[in-house]
Amino acid sequence: MSQPWSPDSWRALPIQQQPRYPDAAHLAQVEQTLASYPPLVFAGEARELRRQFAEVTQGRAFLLQGGDCAESFAEFSAAKIRDTFKVLLQMAIVMTFAAGCPVVKVGRMAGQFAKPRSANDETIDGVTLPAYRGDIVNGIGFDEKSRVPDPERLLQSYHQSTATLNLLRAFAQGGFADLHQVHKWNLDFIANSALAEKYSHLADRIDETLAFMRACGMDSSPQLRETSFFTAHEALLLNYEEAFVRRDSLTNDYYDCSAHMLWIGDRTRQLDGAHVEFLRGVNNPIGVKVGPSMNPEDLIRLIDVLNPDNDPGRLNLIARMGANKVGDHLPQLIRAVEREGKKVLWSSDPMHGNTIKASSGYKTRDFAQILGEVKQFFQVHEAEGTYAGGIHIEMTGQNVTECIGGARPITEDGLSDRYHTHCDPRMNADQSLELAFLIAETLKQVRR
């Protein structure tokens, strides 16, 4: 990695998880068009997120990251964006109050279209076709035409991301994020929840605090009516990402302006690979998914490449172990990081290591396993004397039935009722809020 970096230096290295486009000239034309379009985000915003990440790394804030497994063209609507944003706000206010610290809010939104796959092809009833890699690449329909990778989908992804970002900015700054309104939504959730008795005391304390602030004349403060919200996605399709690399006029640094934060998946984190090469050169805050196959030596080498200056706001290690593997694998990684004095933000992805197949054939996740991994993540960090800095979840504001369990339990038999995901199962609004209240209890104990 001592070679000079450029936005296209990744093209000379081995690359994983890429579609096979049949028309290279068409792809090159689309890449050129994308590069001529305005950026989706600005360097100053990415710098601000990096500053906030540093606060998390140093134990002064907490990271909440959530959103769709994969955004889709078919389910694109203002209502769906609003509902997911709303639930993230609800989760954040509970965590903020319990932890007594700021919660950095990052959505898997406005760009989370591409998905890595375990195989290049898919076979059903003896018919083999290219795997569905997300709407940015090909269609989900199991027919030859749908599954051909189409460069025009890159353009559609850009336009949908633009509209999504526009709406998110309006929601964040236009009064929708008012703390009083968000708290009212939480009161409605608790009133209709089986957990009412357990969490009503926390809601009452938030109510009292807001009433006190109102009595002091602080209810019109911008801090109560507006919020900061950032976007992120997996940097998987590097031809798309390269098109949004811009040089900041203030610092002369390169930024990938397709999102505020980008991350590398567990399948594409090879030290000699294209994805690591690309992300080492952009100045955004970045993440790496860390699974049970990661060993301490490789992790340290990866950190050295991606965060050579040991900046506390640069690198988020996203642990995705599985509930039954956290205790066996996470401690040795934390110890290696501490031993080498590396400054990283640790967060937990309790989703990807806990995917199972129900007897009905649906892919699902058990809420008890999700919660179990989160609890163990906190316990391991407490035992090691380190800071559990965040949570990274796949969720939606919609009332879907994709993950089993929760206070309003979804059973395996009920999965088919509203199973809408284009890829992996997501927690619904109730399950997400239940998780937030449970994490809030843990944060309160940790930060005493």
Describe each PLM feature range.
Residues 1-37, 405-448:
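N-terminal charge/polar-biased segments
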Residues 48-50, 272-275, 302, 330-333:
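Glycine-rich, charged/polar anion/phosphate-binding loops
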Residues 299-309, 313-346, 352-404:
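Non-transmembrane, aqueous-exposed alpha-helical and coiled segments at domain scale
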Residues 1-136:
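Long, contiguous, compositionally biased segments that the model treats as domain-scale units
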Residues 62-70, 280-282, 311-313, 352-357, ...:
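Short acidic (Asp/Glu) and glycine-rich catalytic loops that position anionic groups and cofactors
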Residues 69-71, 109-111, 293, 322-324, ...:
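Short, glycine-/Ser/Thr-/acidic-enriched flexible segments
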Residues 76-322, 365, 390-392, 409-448:
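Active-site-facing alpha/beta catalytic cores
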